[in-house]
């Protein structure tokens, strides 16, 4: 039980598909919530596993409330970087700073696997995200509020086993959101979903980020997803940030637009060229 809870606490305009009917998908973007996220600064961050150097001196500043996506080929260090930011691993060298007012529970992670407790109903799974506040008088109300935000109020008493993949991920998102984190890190949370459910979940992630004002950091293999969601896209190659692309386009963004396609093409070209260079070594 304790190990299961430890893993969980490591946990941030097409119409949705039938599997993910998200309320408020047509939200008014002119009324975005002011940022309540934390800034993030990395200085000369390095991580090695034995003789294998995975991160080779990362310097980065993310302003409070920004949505940053990280892309790169498998093995480039994306997920390692995210784990360091989340405090799941310790750097070999360098440091990570979140400003002066970080509190316990301010940073949460959402993984590709929902990691729901099979013996607990949906509402109880969400309450787990409250940590020490699980026993507070308002715990249930807080969990119900966040279930409403992700469109799963009608599933509050269901067992995880009867939920679809998209619904399980929404429960995992609700669990991460219930403590109102100021930094939410996503490690390929949508990678196992079908295409339509994935698009709807992208819209949901963008909406809750807009509504809650946290700092978002998303690791993904999907360049189109990265460009559609981010304020900035970071490209990592061989343990280093090799490109930092500003996505200066208004929201909500129209998938398939020429502007998004051009940015996606620029990033894909760099990744493909890097792959060809590696294959020649």
Curated annotation (Swiss-Prot):
Quaternary context: The complex is composed of two ATP-binding proteins (SsuB), two transmembrane proteins (SsuC) and a solute-binding protein (SsuA).
Domain ABC transporter: 40-263
Keywords from the named record: ATP-binding, Cell inner membrane, Cell membrane, Membrane, Nucleotide-binding, Translocase, Transport
Positions contributing to ATP binding: 72-79
Pfam families: ABC_tran
CDD domains: ABC_NrtD_SsuB_transporters
Signal peptide from the UniProt entry: none
Family in the record: Belongs to the ABC transporter superfamily. Aliphatic sulfonates importer (TC 3.A.1.17.2) family.
Protein's job: Part of the ABC transporter complex SsuABC involved in aliphatic sulfonates import. Responsible for energy coupling to the transport system.
A GO term from the CC aspect: plasma membrane
Native source organism of the sequence: Rhodopseudomonas palustris (strain BisA53)
Origin: domain of life: Bacteria
Membrane topology field: Peripheral membrane protein
Catalysed transformations (reactions): ATP + H2O + aliphatic sulfonate-[sulfonate-binding protein]Side 1 = ADP + phosphate + aliphatic sulfonateSide 2 + [sulfonate-binding protein]Side 1
A molecular-function term among this protein's GO annotations: ATP binding
SUPFAM superfamilies linked to this entry: P-loop containing nucleoside triphosphate hydrolases
EC number: 7.6.2.14
InterPro entries from the UniProt entry: AAA+_ATPase (IPR003593), ABC_transporter-like_ATP-bd (IPR003439), ABC_transporter-like_CS (IPR017871), ABC_transporter_ATP-bind (IPR050166), P-loop_NTPase (IPR027417)
Subcellular compartments: Cell inner membrane
Official protein name in the record: Aliphatic sulfonates import ATP-binding protein SsuB
